[in-house]
Amino acid sequence: LLFGNGGNGGNGGLLIGNSGDGGAAGNGAGISQNGPASGFGGNGGHAGTTGLIGNGGNGGAGGAGGDVSADFGGVGFGGQGGNGGAGGLLYGNGGAGGNGGAAGSPGSVTAFGGNGGSGGSGGNGGNALIGNAGAGGSAGAGGNGASAGTAGGSGGDGGKGGNGGSVGLIGNGGNGGNGGAGSLFNGAPGFGGPGGSGGASLLGPPGLAGTNGADG
């Protein structure tokens, strides 16, 4: 209760202890025939909380969206990354945000190729009072649009990078996560996702903003 580290996603001790990391998410199931959408990637788990002294855990990664290997089926979007845990109320580092999952891609068997799914966003970095804040997670890439036929699919958009955590007193602000790349295409290109913002710090250097993802 007072001392000790949390397990995955668990809380640290009320006085001293590190919180656990968030669990990684499962991937969406792909399908191999025409029809319904494939599975979406699950969202990564958030880290647990810390007490007075301890480091925040890292957020879990988002799962990848499922692919489709035949026409007219939807595709799974990438899951969101979990948020990093905050550092202790007195001292401790914030955890990093989890990375977003990549999107699935559609089939391209006949003339009407499907569109790529969107990449998952990165989780936000944990905040800190005295200590370094966590970095935001990087976003997942968009899925590729189908390339076959006269009406190729559009590329999926990249996800947004997570924001870096902020520091209330002394320490480095967290860096923002990178935006996901837009996908390849035969129709319209996918747009790259924006990078996350860098975290502020009262008596320390701020974090750097993440880079924007490249367009398809």
Q: Residues of each region from the PLM?
A:
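Collagen triple-helix signature
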Residues: F3-G216
